[in-house]
UniProtKB/Swiss-Prot annotation:
Gene: leuB
Function recorded in the entry: Catalyzes the oxidation of 3-carboxy-2-hydroxy-4-methylpentanoate (3-isopropylmalate) to 3-carboxy-4-methyl-2-oxopentanoate. The product decarboxylates to 4-methyl-2 oxopentanoate.
Binding annotation for substrate: R97, R107, R135, D226
Pathway annotation from the record: Amino-acid biosynthesis; L-leucine biosynthesis; L-leucine from 3-methyl-2-oxobutanoate: step 3/4
HAMAP family: LeuB_type1
Protein name (record): 3-isopropylmalate dehydrogenase
Gene Ontology CC terms, in alphabetical order: cytosol
Chain residues that bind NAD(+): 77-90, 290-302
Pfam families named among the record's database cross-references: Iso_dh (PF00180)
Record-listed Mg(2+) binding positions: D226, D250, D254
Cofactor binding remark: Binds 1 Mg(2+) or Mn(2+) ion per subunit.
């Protein structure tokens, strides 16, 4: 049986609490002989700053580079608002993404039947929703140069951000999206703004070329990103996999997040290239939610997004889709029984703590393996 090297970076706020439930799950899988893990733990964010005056140490970064997958909790909080900008807690996550060369961000939006009433949309619109947004993570307007603010000398200033994409950046993110679509419902929607942006013209052109060369079996649709946002709210189940750039991906994935009813439910994966020597893809997995310092240490945090992020690691880093499917089923079963953390509480539901939710999911997984 293969041994998977896993680096756990709990971070700040509720990060350690939700990561504790991953440790519980990993321990159970190990004890049952279902999967074998070699786990290490490190500091990141404010916790790292408090200990070492940096948001992530070189030693922890070396562990991340050596791991098969990195599991990340959350960083930040008011405690560190006044620390120097270059060592702010969030800089630790940015360095991880940069040094691991993670360019593909995967954000699933799944609405479990038991939570359809929690969405702001009608239950029939979101029940059974299962879409994947693939966001390009290292290019575009967030990283393009020049990026300046110029004083024009007449009481006016001019701010400039630059949207830049090269062909190879679009090709590689398109391949990730097409490969995912092939394993799902064989449908990909590419979103850009080719009607007003030259990068949108190139994006449309390159995605079309990749489709024609390599993925003719996948149904490809092009859509303007603003229209896509509208359609996500109007009838989200029309989509399967959506691929888009950094800026639009940031916006569209947040729109999709709220279709599900709670940020506490949503995992994410950030993937790099596959090493041709080891055939391993560098990857970082994290919940979409933040550090929520206002509820930290109270047992109120929802661990499902963190556990589902580990599920994505099982699927994309460890090639254990069988286990990932069972974990998803266990989460759905627990929710169907009416167990809810505080963020999901509703009439008739049983409100449970962070650890009680994690324990219930592991017990359900145990029943599925019986």
């Amino acid at each position: 049986m293969a041994t998977y090297k896993l680096l756990l970076l709990p971070g700040d706020g509720i990060g350690p609490e939700v990561m504790a439930e991953v440790k519980r799950l990993v321990g159970w899988l190990d004890a049952q002989g279902i999967a074998k893990f070699e786990t290490e733990e490190g500091l990141v964010g404010g916790a790292s700053y408090d200990a070492d005056k940096v948001s992530i140490t070189d030693a922890t970064m070396a562990k991340a580079l050596a791991a098969d997958a990195v599991l990340f909790g959350a960083v930040g909080g008011p405690k560190w608002d006044s620390v120097p900008y270059e060592v702010r807690p969030e800089a630790g996550l940015l360095r991880l993404r940069k040094d691991l060369a993670l360019y593909a961000n995967l954000r699933p939006a799944i609405c479990y039947p038991a939570l359809a009433e929690s969405s702001s949309l009608k239950p029939e619109v979101v029940e059974g929703l299962d879409i994947m947004i693939v966001r390009e993570l290292t290019g575009g307007v967030y990283f393009g140069e020049p990026k300046t603010v110029t004083d024009l000398g007449n009481g006016q200033k001019r701010a400039v951000d630059t949207q830049v994409y090269d062909t190879y950046e679009i090709e590689r993110i398109a391949r990730v999206a097409f490969d995912l679509a092939r394993k799902r419902r064989n449908k990909l929607t590419s979103m850009e703004k080719r009607n007003v942006m030259k990068t949108g013209v190139l994006w449309h052109e390159v995605v079309t070329q990749v489709h024609q060369r390599e993925y003719k079996d996948v149904a490809l649709q092009h859509q303007l990103a603003d229209s896509g946002g509208m359609q996500l709210v109007r009838w989200p189940k029309q989509f399967d996999v959506i691929v888009t750039d950094n800026l639009f991906g940031d916006m569209l994935s947040d729109i999709a997040a709220m279709l599900t009813g709670s940020l506490g439910m949503l995992p994410s994966a950030s993937l790099g290239d596959t090493d041709p020597k080891t055939e391993k893809r560098r990857a970082l997995y994290e919940p979409v939610h933040g550090s929520a310092p206002d509820i930290a240490g109270q047992g109120l945090a929802n661990p499902i997004a963190m556990l589902a992020s580990f599920g994505m690691a099982l699927r994309y880093s460890f090639d254990r889709g069988d286990l990932a499917d069972k974990l998803d089923a266990a989460i759905a079963a627990v929710l169907a029984k009416g167990l809810r953390t505080a963020d999901l509480k509703s009439e008739g539901a049983t409100v449970v703590s962070t650890s009680q939710m994690g324990e219930a999911i592991v017990k359900e997984l145990e029943a599925l393996h019986a």
